[in-house]
Regions:
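Recurring C-terminal helix/loop segment of individual leucine-rich repeat
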Residues: 28-31, 72
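Alpha-helical solenoid repeats of the armadillo/HEAT superfamily
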Residues: 7-24, 35-36, 47-66, 73-77, ...
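A positional/structural detector of protein chain ends, strongest at the extreme C-terminus
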Residues: 230-233
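Buried hydrophobic core positions in alpha-solenoid tandem helical repeats
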Residues: 1, 41-43, 82-84, 129-131, ...
Length: 233
């Protein structure tokens, strides 16, 4: 009921933040939160909530979406239908939280039909969101997009793979990926050459990981070219 206190933004934020913290603490709590109907209330309220409340709601959803066992329930509730419009929110936090939730849901899902259902709608759908985030200058957004795209491409769902391959923006996706690789390599080639002997113990940079993931996407998207069925220019 606290989620419904629309006249008190601070109370709503506090209630949802508490739910998020509870969800993060155990799988049992995640299940209890979903069983209590919290996700359904979030779905009903989030699109019309203040930005601060949207931020908390999408962050909570992203945490819940980490559960392998509970993903089917979240997807069956139609949560993607409200997350997708929020990836284009005026708030960077809401955008990032919504995209993170979609990414978590896309990883090792049992059924990818809910992703096919939102391929091009609402608000440009899954495809529009991926293109928008690949074009972003924010490396966190780029990483979420390329990682999510790999989950979808490797899902084994033929219909979803065909959506990606048959998209009129397939070449645009490919060019965005290739651009990320080229930009990263040109900017870091000299530094990598001069410091190669000293980097073995360092963490992989976000840019390097994006480039590595992008190469994998490029391989998958254009693997048909190896069979002599390259895209028309």
């Amino acid at each position: 009921e606290l989620l419904s206190h629309e006249e008190n933004e601070e109370l709503q934020c506090h209630a949802i933040s508490t739910l998020r913290n509870l969800a993060a603490s155990s799988e049992r709590n995640k299940a209890a939160i979903i069983d209590a109907g919290a996700v359904e209330r979030i779905r009903e309220l989030v699109l019309h909530a203040p930005l601060s409340v949207q931020s908390e709601m999408t962050a909570c959803t992203a945490v819940l979406a980490l559960s392998e066992d509970l993903k089917p329930q979240l997807l069956d509730m139609g949560i993607c239908e409200v997350l997708l419009p929020l990836t284009d929110s005026p708030s960077i936090e809401v955008q990032g939280n919504s995209a993170a939730a979609l990414g978590n849901l896309s990883s090792k899902a049992d059924d990818y039909a809910p992703f096919n259902a939102v391929w091009d709608k609402p608000a440009g759908g899954l495809h529009g969101y991926l293109v928008r985030f690949l074009e972003s200058e924010d490396t966190t957004f780029q990483h979420i997009a390329v990682w999510t795209l790999i989950q979808l491409l490797e899902s084994g769902n033929h219909e979803l793979e065909q959506h990606l391959r048959d998209s009129p923006h397939r070449l645009d996706l490919g060019r965005q990926v290739q651009s990320r690789i080229g930009t990263f390599e040109s900017e870091h080639e000299q530094a990598d050459t001069s410091t190669a002997a000293d980097t073995s113990g360092q963490d992989v940079s976000p840019e390097r990981e994006i480039a590595a993931l992008s190469r994998r996407i490029e391989e998958i998207l254009f693997e048909e070219s190896d069979d002599g069925t390259s895209d028309a220019k």
